[in-house]
Regions:
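Basic, Lys/Arg-enriched alpha-helical interface segments
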Residues: 1-92, 100-108, 113-118
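Hydrophobic/aromatic beta-strand elements that line small-molecule binding cavities or substrate pockets
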Residues: 96
Length: 118
């Protein structure tokens, strides 16, 4: 599957890499895998595999203008689902926002609830 990254995601990633709260996402392995949460999610996207319930991936609603911007960035013409997952389990605060379509995955944002839903 194709994976794309938004400009805003790249800015978010630079910011959170310096936050100790995110060390476990990029440097510690999961209890059910030798991979870190970040590696596990990216490998799942690349292979088209479903994510385990641990990540609590669920659809969220985006505005029509935001969906339009995603369509322009990805060239996608079919239905786009915007998803939210929790790297650190259902009650965690380390989130990834991404869109899922027939073409693949487009990573939109990464951060905490307060970073992403102001």
């Amino acid at each position: 599957m194709i994976i794309g990254y938004s400009r805003q995601f790249k800015k978010d990633l630079k910011r959170i890499k310096h936050n100790r709260k995110w060390n476990k996402i990029f440097n510690s392995s999961l209890s059910f895998s030798e991979l870190t949460p970040w590696e596990y999610v990216i490998k799942s996207f690349e292979s088209g595999s479903d994510l385990p319930d641990y990540f609590y991936a669920h659809e969220i609603h985006f505005s029509k203008s935001d969906i339009k911007n995603i369509r322009m960035a990805t060239g996608e013409k079919s239905k786009i689902k915007v998803m939210d997952l929790h790297f650190d389990g259902r009650t965690g605060d380390c989130l990834l926002l991404y869109s899922e379509s027939e073409l693949g995955f487009y990573i939109l944002r990464i951060g905490s609830h307060s970073d992403l839903f102001k």
